[in-house]
């Protein structure tokens, strides 16, 4: 691997953005491939917002939506990060990245293979190191967070969020029915337990309230107008009301994972 080689990251959600920011900060050339309708809830720290807005800024890093690789080159030349809509990774053979990071966090493999790049890394469960990809990075909060897995897989998804401020499952909110998500509150708002933060509008025009289970800061909220199904993750409340800036900063979890990815890429770079 050479310093000016392309590092391709599949996914632009908040955990992916932690890795993208770390690689960008290290002076590496990063290309992000995203879905056509990303569903990030921590939108203030997700480069996936560029798909909707044309651009995004996270902790000083600018991301820009591009349609061609020629446009991506222009974005790299000004020191920014290009984002392209390519959920299936069809551009990967054309890009020929030196390393590929699957940061989709789908809890399953959506099509990443070891032959996509000389070095392939996946974040979280759904991949087996040495089979699907070269290496896997643990994403579950706890003692093993960020651990590099060279054989085997990450801890399976438990469906139970990690504990923050004494709360786990209570801080994450899911849709109870299908419909269109309509925001009532905004990211950064201080909310009370039981407060309506959004509504789900069903085809018959009825709006069902989406309420919080705990008090705190609304750290994440799905984009207004997004279609949801039962169980769809739509919001995240941080009980630490004194830490409003967390809504706009990359999380400790994302930074821990990012450090492991950078370690692996740096080790390959300095071979």
Features from the language model and the residues they span:
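Well-ordered secondary-structure scaffolds
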Residues: 1-271
């Amino acid at each position: 691997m050479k310093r000016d080689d392309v590092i391709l990251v599949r996914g632009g959600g908040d955990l992916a953005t932690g890795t993208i920011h770390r690689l960008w900060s290290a002076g590496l050339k990063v290309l992000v491939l995203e879905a056509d309708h990303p569903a990030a809830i921590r939108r203030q720290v997700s480069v996936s917002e560029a798909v909707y807005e044309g651009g995004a800024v996270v902790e000083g890093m600018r991301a820009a939506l591009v349609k061609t690789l020629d446009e991506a080159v222009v974005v790299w030349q000004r020191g920014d990060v290009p984002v392209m809509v390519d959920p299936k990774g069809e551009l990967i053979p054309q890009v020929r990245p030196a390393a590929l990071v699957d940061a989709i966090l789908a809890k399953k493999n959506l099509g990443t293979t070891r032959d996509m790049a000389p070095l392939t890394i996946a974040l979280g469960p759904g991949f087996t190191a040495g089979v699907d990809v070269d290496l896997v990075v643990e994403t579950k909060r706890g003692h093993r967070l960020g651990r590099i897995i060279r054989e085997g897989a990450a801890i399976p998804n438990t469906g139970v969020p990690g504990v923050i401020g004494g709360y786990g499952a209570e801080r994450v909110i899911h849709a109870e029915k299908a419909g269109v998500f309509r925001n009532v509150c905004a990211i950064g708002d201080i909310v009370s337990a039981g407060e309506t933060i959004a509504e789900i509008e069903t085809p018959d025009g009825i709006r069902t309230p989406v309420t919080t289970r705990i008090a705190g800061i609304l750290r994440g909220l799905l984009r207004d107008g997004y279609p949801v199904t039962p169980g769809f993750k739509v919001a995240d409340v941080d009980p630490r009301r004194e830490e409003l800036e967390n809504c706009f900063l990359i999380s400790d979890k994302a930074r821990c994972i990012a450090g492991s990815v950078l370690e692996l890429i740096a080790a390959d770079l300095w071979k």
